[in-house]
Amino acid sequence: MKRTGPTDINLRRLIRYLRKKSNEEGVKIWKDIAWRLERPRRQRAEVNVSKINRYTKEGDTVIVPGSVLGAGKLEHKVVVAAWKFSETAKKKITEAGGEAITIEELIERNPKGSGVIIME
């Protein structure tokens, strides 16, 4: 079978945007995130809030090339950028004083991608 990639038009647009920003800024992190988002849905990252809590500290910035799910609890303030958030995950992140943002917003804030943790 021929590999077609994601069929969601918004995801395809995001992947093109990530590749463009990677070339413009000369930063490989955005190309890596684009590659991870391009994988089949069943191989895409699904990260629980508890994992974010376990592997980050106060003030970290995390990018999830997939979905953030609401299992567990978050005990410190972090900025989380992802393709999708569940409602409970968004609620738990904001209640902890953090932010749940889109990947595009993260690129606008930090075009060089410095200090960003990729979590899968």
Curated annotation (Swiss-Prot):
GO biological process: translation
Origin: domain of life: Archaea
PANTHER family, alphabetized: 60S RIBOSOMAL PROTEIN L18 (PTHR10934), LARGE RIBOSOMAL SUBUNIT PROTEIN EL18 (PTHR10934:SF2)
KW Oxidoreductase (keyword) present: no
Name this polypeptide is given: Large ribosomal subunit protein eL18
Gene: rpl18e
Record SUPFAM superfamilies: Ribosomal proteins L15p and L18e
Similarity-based family: Belongs to the eukaryotic ribosomal protein eL18 family.
Parts of the chain that traverse the membrane: none
MF terms (GO), sorted A to Z: RNA binding; structural constituent of ribosome
HAMAP family reported for this sequence: Ribosomal_eL18 (MF_00329)
Pfam families in UniProt: Ribosomal_L18 (PF17135)
